[in-house]
A protein has these predicted regions:
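N-terminal subdomain of nucleotide-sugar transferases
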Residues: 1-63, 250, 414-431
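A short helix/loop element that forms part of the nucleotide-sugar donor recognition site in Leloir-type
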Residues: 55-59, 206-221
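Nucleotide-sugar-dependent
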Residues: 238, 289-296, 303-324, 329-342
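Helix-loop-beta element that forms the nucleotide-linked donor phosphate-binding surface
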Residues: 175-176, 181-202
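A short, well-ordered alpha-helix in the C-terminal region of glycosyltransferases
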Residues: 360, 367, 374-388
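Conserved donor-binding/catalytic core segment of Leloir-type glycosyltransferases
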Residues: 201, 220-238, 244-247
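Membrane-proximal helix-turn-helix segments that form the acceptor-binding/catalytic region
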Residues: 99, 118, 122-126, 154-174
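Nucleotide-activated donor-binding/catalytic signature segment of Leloir-type glycosyltransferases, i.e.
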Residues: 268-294
Length: 431
């Protein structure tokens, strides 16, 4: 009988946390288990968004997946020094755990905590010939350089780049989220295997979902001719100003075109403060439970996605994939040369909004509000683009193939032909 291959996932947050990246790592564990892998997880006992909450169960075997949660102090993640201390605390705990544990064939390290690349030289010493893989969701120190609010931090980020360059030398495979991110990482001249494997949507309906009329009215009001929704995190990397500008132009041209913002993040309060009593075509809503998430995403006709240009290749907004998964094209406020900008143009799954084409976008939205056949055609294309290029099955099949290929020099690991069913998703995950 062929011995099952083994893999360890290392990431700051994991099930039952509801933050999107934790859900992706939880999904990955589940999907690799289905494909015949023995999966171990090293994570923390903390939640991303709920600073004072802890996960009590430190060791857990859930549906065959071995989860080990290292204790982490409740130091404030929103402050720079405590956040770095949290990272170092976890790095030391994880390395000690790996030192004591049986080694696995592969180790997949995510990019949270920040500067997790520092783990790789030590992992190489501890794990020998195991395959070391870096899955980059947020690129550091580039994220600090993109923020640029603190000159001292910016200087520190520049000084640490040579250390990160050295750490990449110990990685075998680097997984990025898009071509621009791959280009940024390639600037380190790492000469390692590079591959783009995007995150998938948390909800993947098999057909384009129908709109719930009651929920649509709750979100956009009555007599809506076109609904545009921003759903998810509104953080430092995102912008909303151009969305407000076109909404205010449309308020007079076509009152039936409505905008809704439903989310959280560093800039969400700024958005709410920017609204006036005259912005009656702009609504603000809270998060939806996972049971309501698919309905929430489907009630919009078009989804809003944004990324500031200095963040191109540093992060890739996951809401892009969630939008396509429910058959909704995107209005993307960002650079046409960014990862999402390139996909929007290549797959014709949305529009790009910038300061030079505001009036053009406004006119297109007015036209779409009246031409439902064109809108439906656009939505069907968005749904098919997701199925063909970004679905969880497609991405995880690529992950499985990649991981098994790394073992060919030691003997081929056959693929699992009869995957078992395993699902430990939490019913309270967020958008």
């Amino acid at each position: 009988m062929t011995q099952k291959p083994t893999v360890t996932l290392i990431y700051h947050f994991f099930y039952p946390d509801d933050v999107v990246s934790a859900r992706h790592f939880s999904d990955m564990a589940e999907e690799l288990d289905k494909r015949g892998w023995n999966v171990n997880v090293l994570t923390s006992n903390r939640y991303c968004r709920y600073q004072h909450s802890k996960i009590d169960q430190r060791k857990e075997i859930l549906h065959g997946i071995d989860i080990r949660r290292s204790y982490r102090p409740g130091w404030n993640q929103s402050k720079n020094i405590p956040r770095l201390c949290n990272a170092l605390w976890l790095f030391l705990n994880w390395l000690f755990t790996i030192f004591r544990a049986k080694k696995t064939d592969c180790y997949i390290v995510g990019s949270d905590p920040q500067f997790s690349q520092i783990l790789f030289p030590f992992l190489r010493i501890l794990t020998g010939n195991s395959t070391l893989i870096y899955w980059c969701f947020d690129l550091y120190p580039e994220a600090i350089l993109a923020d640029a609010r603190n000159s001292l931090l910016t200087l520190g980020a520049r000084l640490v780049k040579p250390l990160i360059w050295a750490c990449y030398r110990y990685v075998d495979v680097i997984i990025d989220l898009g071509p621009i991110m791959q280009k940024r990482i390639a600037a380190y001249n790492h000469n390692k295997i590079s591959k783009t494997l995007t995150p998938w949507a948390l909800k993947e309906p098999s057909v384009i979902p129908l709109q719930d009329i009651n929920m649509r009215e709750q979100l956009f009001g009555t007599d809506v001719t076109l609904g545009l929704l921003y759903s998810g995190n509104l953080g430092l990397a995102h912008e909303y100003e151009l969305f407000l500008e076109i909404a205010r132009k449309l308020r007079q041209l076509e009152p039936g075109i409505r905008f809704a913002f439903a989310g959280r993040g560093n800039r969400f309060e700024s958005l709410k403060n920017a609204l006036s009593n005259e912005d009656h075509n702009i609504k603000v809503a809270g998060f939806a439970s996972e049971s309501e998430l698919e309905k929430r995403l489907a009630v919009a006709d078009i989804h809003l996605v944004s990324l500031r240009e200095q963040w191109d290749g540093v992060v890739v907004p996951s809401k892009f994939f969630g939008s396509l998964a429910v058959g909704r094209p995107v209005l993307y406020s960002g650079s046409k040369d960014s990862d999402i900008g390139q996909w929007v143009q290549e797959y014709e799954c949305g529009m790009i909004l910038d300061r030079n084409n505001v009036d053009e976008v406004v006119n297109t939205l007015v036209h779409l509000s009246k031409d439902k056949q064109l809108l439906e055609k656009w939505q069907k294309n968005a749904f098919q683009v997701y199925q063909d290029h970004f679905s969880k099955k497609k991405i995880m099949d690529s992950w499985d193939e990649l991981l098994r290929a790394q073992k060919r020099s030691e003997g081929w690991i056959p693929a699992c032909r009869t995957p078992k069913v395993c699902d430990f998703r939490e019913p309270h995950a967020r958008e």
